[in-house]
């Protein structure tokens, strides 16, 4: 894994953690870790974490 891909992976896992533990919606979590665009963050979540943000949140 390249350094850039690893950095993206860390950022996306922080988005996931904030959604699960802090009960942030995907937009708030994405902006909190530095994403500036909702479509880009959703696309990265889908590509790197292999799930849509709706699938991350419980119930």
Swiss-Prot record:
The keyword Transcription applies. One of its GO terms (molecular function) is sequence-specific DNA binding. The keyword DNA-binding applies. Coiled coil: none annotated. Residues 26-49 bind DNA. It comes from the Bacteria. InterPro entries: HTH_AraC (IPR018060). Residues 1-59 form the HTH araC/xylS-type domain. Keywords: DNA-binding, Transcription, Transcription regulation. This is Putative HTH-type transcriptional regulator YneL. It comes from Escherichia coli (strain K12). The lineage of its organism: Bacteria, Pseudomonadati, Pseudomonadota, Gammaproteobacteria, Enterobacterales. The gene is yneL.
């Amino acid at each position: 894994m390249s350094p850039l891909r690893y950095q993206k992976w860390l950022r996306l896992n922080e988005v996931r953690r904030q959604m699960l533990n802090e009960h942030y919606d995907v937009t708030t979590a994405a902006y909190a870790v530095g994403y500036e665009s909702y479509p880009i963050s959703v696309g990265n979540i889908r590509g790197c974490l292999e799930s849509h943000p709706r699938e991350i949140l419980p119930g």
